[in-house]
């Protein structure tokens, strides 16, 4: 810690960078591989999710698409503990708390793989979840949607469930077709926790646009 303190200068990140920041982000970008050359650091997962949404919103405003303001997430899901990320999370217990308060997202079924409604199998439920995602996009209007954020390994809300590979390919196709950002929330499963540095690396044909 003393050595780090001797190296690290204070610099407001929107104005300048310091050498430890440069070294760390370069290392993360190298491990993340092609397509993930840009890195933004945050103090935790909740803030990181908000940074991702702010980035996507800024992109669409800058490219003349300010009408894109809807965010899609899964039910159930968990994306953080701030007002914004709780609103993004799919937890029915929060319904009375929010009731129009804060930032909320439109929910679609999570691609669960166990304890499924009969007569579903993991394969049929994955297709059901994909159909629901497409239907919600059409309901809102494809040109009004910012992004679809999901957990490639379910966390607090779903008990570490892992969707089928075909589901990832399906959401990638849907998001690409509608020019919607696909965001993987890897706060639980990223940085080597499942073997590869990014869990997204298990799905080379369905890589997300942003990994948190």
Task: Give the positions of each predicted feature.
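Conserved N-terminal phosphate-binding loop of PLP-dependent enzymes in the Aspartate aminotransferase
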Residues: 1-212
């Amino acid at each position: 810690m003393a050595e780090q303190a001797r190296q690290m200068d204070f610099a407001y990140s929107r104005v300048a960078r310091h050498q430890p920041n440069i070294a760390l982000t370069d290392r993360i970008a190298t491990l993340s591989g092609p397509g993930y050359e840009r890195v933004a650091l945050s103090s935790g997962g909740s803030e990181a999710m908000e940074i991702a949404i702010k980035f996507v919103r800024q992109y669409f405003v800058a490219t003349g698409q300010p009408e894109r303001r809807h965010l899609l997430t899964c039910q159930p899901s968990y994306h953080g503990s701030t007002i914004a990320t709780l609103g993004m999370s799919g937890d029915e217990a929060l319904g009375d708390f929010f009731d129009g308060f804060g930032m909320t997202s439109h929910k679609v079924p999570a691609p669960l793989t166990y304890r499924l409604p009969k007569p579903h199998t993991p394969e049929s439920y994955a297709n059901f979840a994909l159909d629901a995602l497409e239907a919600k996009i059409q309901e809102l209007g494809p040109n009004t949607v910012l992004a679809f954020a999901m957990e490639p390994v379910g966390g607090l809300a779903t008990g570490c469930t892992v969707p089928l590979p075909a589901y990832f390919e399906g959401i990638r196709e849907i998001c690409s077709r509608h020019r919607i950002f696909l965001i993987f929330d890897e706060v639980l499963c990223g940085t080597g926790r499942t073997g590869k540095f990014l869990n997204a690396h298990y799905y080379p044909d369905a890589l997300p646009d942003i990994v948190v």
